[in-house]
Swiss-Prot record:
InterPro entries: NA-bd_OB-fold (IPR012340), RNA_pol_III_Rbc25 (IPR013238), RNA_pol_Rpb7-like_N_sf (IPR036898), RNAP_E/RPC8 (IPR004519), Rpb7-like (IPR045113), Rpb7-like_N (IPR005576). One of its GO terms (cellular component) is RNA polymerase III complex. Keywords: DNA-directed RNA polymerase, Nucleus, Phosphoprotein, Transcription. It comes from Saccharomyces cerevisiae (strain ATCC 204508 / S288c). The keyword Nucleus applies. One of its GO terms (biological process) is tRNA transcription by RNA polymerase III. The modification Phosphoserine is found at S162. This is DNA-directed RNA polymerase III subunit RPC8. The gene is RPC25. DNA-dependent RNA polymerase catalyzes the transcription of DNA into RNA using the four ribonucleoside triphosphates as substrates. Specific peripheric component of RNA polymerase III which synthesizes small RNAs, such as 5S rRNA and tRNA. The RPC25/RPC8-RPC17/RPC9 subcomplex may bind Pol III transcripts emerging from the adjacent exit pore during elongation.
Amino acid sequence: MFILSKIADLVRIPPDQFHRDTISAITHQLNNKFANKIIPNVGLCITIYDLLTVEEGQLKPGDGSSYINVTFRAVVFKPFLGEIVTGWISKCTAEGIKVSLLGIFDDIFIPQNMLFEGCYYTPEESAWIWPMDEETKLYFDVNEKIRFRIEREVFVDVKPKSPKERELEERAQLENEIEGKNEETPQNEKPPAYALLGSCQTDGMGLVSWWE
């Protein structure tokens, strides 16, 4: 689930960090830049593990900061394909089940076609149901512990909203308030920069309580 990933980067050390020793200053800046952020095509960076190489610092004209080329290793959350993972159901929709690894990662989705054969969604209870036989129905309920298999990882280049897009959204929201409308302004929900797709289709998968 966690790997060590080797990364090279140019680190900027601002003057207010000069009181630190070089290694501490570099590690501090790297954690600010990478920790708890998605590294494209790598995974979710948890923390900086160690520094492998540190070159001499360079100064740029008109800038009091020091620039240092470094190679380091980072602890990265990146489950391998086929890995069996345990999480908690955070949401059920007609499209499938959203799973959270509490405090670590929330963008995990099990699509409806990756659930056990015969599973169906009940809007009244906001839950998925697996009918094992005519008399036994097993529920996928929110906040239940679920075991699943990693089938695919998805990286998306998510770009920040432009000033024009933000201006249009704010204007639409203001118009709604003036007209006394309570509905929220429709917004295009952007996909997460890194997401995992899972499956529950084999023995032992599904709610952990079923198999205890």
